A protein has these predicted regions:
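Extracytosolic ligand-binding ectodomains
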Residues: 1-182
């Protein structure tokens, strides 16, 4: 097994070159944005990868976001578009709830572990002690040859992790395991 810890176009370049060399070992990574996966192209990408969001997510919020994005821009949103959208939604919620733009008040609000609808099945929150966003993630692999219907349809998304009966914090180090101090 080959494990990578690359980001952005480094991942895209790596998977294209890996496919070119025809190496037989499975590849896994720690993050892959959908736009980078699409850029790698069908036939180049393999293995198992995580992502924070994808356009096939079947929640009402995600379906509405995808439909509105497609109507306005004429294409499927990749997860960076979702990140930008929900980041602004979270900030708007904090501004509304605190009725303030004061930095200390906003930090206190985020540290309160307020819940945010980020268009997934479960709400997200920022962990108070390290500011880590606790949220679901999604594994994906590549569809079998001939299954895809287009350039952006060759990824096969799995169920959310952690499982619905597991706490979101099970994806992150505990306070005892972490050196992060905020």
């Amino acid at each position: 097994m080959i494990a990578t810890n690359l980001a952005g176009n480094q991942v895209t370049n790596f998977v294209k070159q890996y496919a070119e060399f025809g190496l037989p070992y499975p590849v896994v990574g720690f993050n892959l944005n959908t736009a980078d996966a699409w850029a790698a192209g069908e036939g180049n990408l393999g293995g198992i990868w995580p992502t924070v969001w994808h356009h096939e997510l079947q929640t009402q919020g995600s379906k509405t976001f995808v439909a509105n994005f497609q109507k306005k821009y004429g294409k499927i949103p990749e997860n960076h578009a979702w990140i930008e959208y929900v980041s602004l939604m979270m900030l708007a919620q904090a501004l509304k709830e605190t009725k303030s733009t004061d930095t200390d008040k906003l930090i206190a609000y985020f540290e309160s572990e307020a819940k945010f609808d980020i268009l997934k099945k479960r709400p997200a929150y920022f962990r108070s002690w390290d500011h880590q966003l606790m949220q679901e993630a999604y594994p994906f692999t590549v569809k079998a040859k001939g299954e895809s219907k287009g350039k952006q349809d060759f990824l096969k998304f799995g169920e959310a992790v952690p499982a619905p009966d597991q706490p979101l914090e099970s994806l992150a180090p505990t306070r005892a395991e972490s050196d992060c101090k905020m």
